[in-house]
């Protein structure tokens, strides 16, 4: 909600900075209002139309394609953002603030440099920015939307790229936002992102600079950005918050056309009323949603919509505007985050004022007007029986309690008095369960309640009812003093005291008021303290204490008295016990004597024990028995060393070995000699073989030689074979025949004789080859 507003305001600032002030005022807010009117019918329509124009105007889609690539991340980011549209949108806008100069106007001091950088970068690369923008505009909805998501979530990632790129992408995002308007679901994602809102303003501001020639696009972008911001998380978060279309928030933002984000801090009260008028009954939910974004309190808000819608609207808007004003730099938070935090701050700051200025401050400090009125009216209702005021107070209380989930705890305390208890109690139990999630509001609301309670108490001081109101008022101050629980007790006793003064009228009513008083007085102590002590679940403990406090309040007050009295008793009892303690002291001494350790204590220093140790040293006689007194003297090793020398003397054994000298040469001298002898044996064997040299060639040298011998025979055979060949022709050669035959006989192969000489030659060759192979 606040994001669109802040963005719009930022757009105004940027427009003024970039010379877009005219279009900003005319197209910015005017466009916002017009588009808000259009967006009332359908925020998405105007973005759709505008993107159509942008898309038609921009021919290129390259940048959009590049953007569509990161679109996956952007889509994932928007999906994540959809989970918590309001919160994530609030968180993202913060991250995006650096992206656009929007943060500047949001009130972030550093953003001016970002604006300068963005402006400088945009000025440096206006064409690239335009191309990116054109790409965004050109790209159809899904890629553009994804890029919008990209620019939304990536708003932070884009920042690293550079304010210039971030600005360009945001400016491009504006058109894509318009295209995103075409794609409603993606626009919703963009809305969740809320980055489009901020990026939209950069489009107007930095974008305006980047593409000065595309004023229509800038206007459309702004319009689309404004409308898309309206469509964007504000439309979702703000409907939950304000129940009204995000346009209302935009309109509220536009209602202050000259209201810059920085100047937004100053919001006129009339503006709140305007906002309230602009925000229909749907706004009641807004404050509650703004305070409890993810608490889904609209259901509870519906209960209270009847009575406090206007006040809540005004208050919610005032808180939202205050949030924007106080946190203009946090557009993402919007009135939701700002509303709560600023609302709390303004509430606390306005507590004195709210007590006095409750009518005017009421819109800003919802709890102030509601809670004090609830208290006063509730008191009057229970005691005066004023049905109308009580009903209003009740309804407002319910609404405020429900809307103010943290406030409900306060409201239950207020309703606790008398007859209003039954009606308010349901609201308090229903509302209180939720408050634990919003402890901040409780604290902020309580202070106002206290101030308003004081006022109401003063107003009712004239009547006996004021007495009852006074305890109630005291209880609300107790709420203020949740941190200061002591105040509650002090105020609580006055509460019972005041009713006694008006005992005549309220004798009968005193019991119920006393119950509520005790409930209020004590629950603030117990419940509020417990709740306050545990900020994580202050509402829940408060509601628990309140619920039981209703039945048990009377008992608690007496318990307080008893407890107060008991502490002094306990000290007295402790003193008596302490007195008794001295009596056992002598017993303890006796016990020590019984223990028989008194003497030991005296000797504890170890004097006697040490002497005993010395005596043990004197017992060295035992060592003398060992016959090693001398050795003991030489214990350091003297005697043992001598013994070592004796074994050295035992080297005679080595002499027996007859290798004393060799022992020194043990490294292998003698062994080497033995090896030499072995070599001799080998030589001898080889000599026997007659192949000592061949032994070196053992791998087959000797075999080869043997083969050579065979070869000699074979050579002869070969000669025979040659002869054989010749024999066929030279058969008459007898010597040739005989020699081969004899040779064949030597080989003892009669077949050779039978075989022809050529076959013998082949066989000889084969045999030689096989032998050679074997030898190898």
UniProtKB/Swiss-Prot annotation:
PTM annotation (N6,N6-dimethyllysine): residues: 480, 646
Q: Which UniProt keywords apply?
A: Acetylation, Cell membrane, Cell projection, Cytoplasm, Cytoskeleton, Isopeptide bond, Membrane, Methylation, Microtubule, Phosphoprotein, Repeat, Ubl conjugation
Descriptive protein name: Microtubule-associated protein tau
Phosphoserine-modified residues are where? Answer: 46, 61, 214, 502, 526, 530, 533-534, 537, 549, 570, 572, 597, 620, 624, 628, 640, 659, 687, 691, 731, 735, 739, 744, 751, 757
Record PTM Phosphothreonine, positions in chain: 69, 71, 111, 470, 486, 492, 498, 540, 547, 552, 566, 738, 762
* Purpose: Promotes microtubule assembly and stability, and might be involved in the establishment and maintenance of neuronal polarity. The C-terminus binds axonal microtubules while the N-terminus binds neural plasma membrane components, suggesting that tau functions as a linker protein between both. Axonal polarity is predetermined by tau localization (in the neuronal cell) in the domain of the cell body defined by the centrosome. The short isoforms allow plasticity of the cytoskeleton whereas the longer isoforms may preferentially play a role in its stabilization.
Q: What species is this protein from?
A: Gorilla gorilla gorilla (Western lowland gorilla)
Residues that bear N6-acetyllysine: 480, 560, 594, 616, 625, 633, 646, 652, 656, 666, 678, 682, 704, 720
């Amino acid at each position: 909600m606040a994001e669109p507003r802040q963005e719009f305001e930022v757009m105004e600032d940027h427009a003024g900075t970039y010379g877009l002030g005219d279009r900003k005022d005319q197209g910015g807010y005017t466009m916002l209002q017009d588009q808000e009117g259009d967006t009332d019918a359908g925020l998405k329509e105007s973005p759709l139309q505008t993107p159509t124009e942008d898309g038609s105007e921009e021919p290129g889609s390259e940048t959009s394609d590049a953007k569509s690539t990161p679109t996956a991340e952007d889509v994932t980011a928007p999906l994540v953002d959809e989970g918590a549209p309001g919160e994530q949108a609030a968180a993202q806008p913060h991250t995006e603030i650096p992206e656009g100069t929007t943060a500047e106007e949001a009130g972030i001091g550093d953003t001016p440099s970002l604006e300068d950088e963005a402006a400088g970068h945009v000025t440096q690369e206006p064409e690239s920015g335009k191309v990116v923008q054109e790409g965004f505009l050109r790209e159809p909805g899904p890629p553009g939307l994804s890029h919008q998501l990209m620019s939304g979530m990536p708003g932070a990632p884009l920042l690293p790229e550079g304010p210039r790129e971030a600005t360009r992408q945001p400016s491009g995002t504006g058109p894509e936002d318009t295209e995103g308007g075409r794609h409603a679901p993606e626009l919703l994602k963009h809305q969740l992102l809320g980055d489009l809102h901020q990026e939209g303003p950069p489009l107007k501001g930095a974008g305006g600079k980047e593409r000065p020639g595309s004023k229509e696009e800038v206007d459309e972008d702004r319009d689309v950005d404004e409308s898309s911001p309206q469509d964007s998380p504000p439309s979702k978060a703000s409907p939950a918050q304000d129940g009204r279309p995000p346009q209302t928030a935009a309109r509220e933002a536009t209602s202050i056309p000259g209201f810059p984000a920085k100047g937004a801090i100053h919001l006129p009260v009339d503006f709140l009323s305007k906002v309230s008028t602009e925000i229909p009954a749907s706004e009641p939910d807004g404050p509650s949603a703004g305070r409890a974004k993810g608490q889904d309190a609209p259901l509870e808000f519906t209960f209270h919509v009847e009575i406090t819608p206007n006040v809540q609207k005004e208050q919610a808007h005032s808180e939202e505007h205050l949030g924007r004003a106080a946190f203009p730099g946090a557009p993402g938070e919007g009135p939701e985050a700002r509303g709560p935090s600023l609302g709390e701050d303004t509430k606390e700051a306005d507590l004195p004022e709210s007590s006095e200025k409750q009518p005017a401050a009421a819109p800003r400090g919802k709890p102030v007007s509601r809670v004090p009125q609830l208290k006063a009216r509730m008191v009057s209702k229970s005691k005066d029986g004023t049905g109308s005021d009580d009903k209003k107070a009740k309804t407002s209380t319910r609404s405020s309690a429900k809307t103010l989930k943290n406030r409900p705890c306060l409201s239950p305390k207020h309703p606790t008095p008398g007859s209003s208890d039954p009606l308010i109690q349901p609201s308090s139990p229903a509302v209180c369960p939720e408050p634990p999630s919003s402890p901040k509001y409780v604290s902020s609301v309580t202070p106002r309640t206290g101030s308003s309670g004081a006022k109401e108490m003063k107003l009712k001081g004239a009547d006996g009812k004021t007495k009852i109101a006074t305890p109630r008022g005291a209880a609300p101050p107790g709420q203020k003093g949740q941190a200061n629980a002591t105040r509650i007790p002090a105020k609580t006793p006055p509460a019972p005291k005041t009713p006694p003064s008006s005992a005549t009228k309220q004798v009968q009513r005193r019991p119920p008021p006393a119950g509520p008083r005790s409930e209020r007085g004590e629950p603030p102590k117990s419940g509020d303290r417990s709740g306050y002590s545990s900020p994580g679940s202050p509402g829940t403990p408060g509601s628990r204490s309140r619920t039981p406090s209703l039945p048990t309040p009377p008992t608690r007050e007496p318990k307080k008295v008893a407890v107060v009295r008991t502490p002094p008793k306990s000290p007295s009892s402790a003193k008596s016990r302490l007195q008794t303690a001295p009596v056992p002291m002598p017993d303890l001494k006796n016990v020590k004597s019984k223990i028989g350790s008194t003497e030991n204590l005296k000797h504890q220093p170890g004097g006697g024990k040490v002497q005993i140790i010395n005596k043990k040293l004197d017992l060295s006689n035992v060592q003398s028995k060992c016959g090693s007194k001398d050795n003991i003297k030489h214990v350091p090793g003297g005697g043992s060393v001598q013994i070592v020398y004796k074994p050295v003397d035992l080297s005679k054994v080595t002499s027996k070995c007859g290798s004393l000298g060799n022992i020194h040469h043990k490294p292998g001298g003698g062994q080497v000699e033995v090896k030499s002898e072995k070599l001799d044996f080998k030589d001898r064997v080889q000599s026997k073989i007659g192949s000592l040299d061949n032994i070196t060639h053992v791998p087959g040298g000797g075999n080869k030689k043997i083969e050579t011998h065979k070869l000699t025979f074979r050579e002869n055979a070969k000669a025979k074979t040659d002869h054989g060949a010749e024999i066929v022709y030279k058969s008459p050669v007898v010597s040739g025949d005989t020699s081969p035959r004899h040779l064949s006989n030597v080989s003892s192969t009669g077949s050779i004789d039978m075989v022809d000489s050529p076959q013998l030659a082949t066989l000889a060759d084969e045999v030689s080859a096989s032998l050679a192979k074997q030898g190898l």
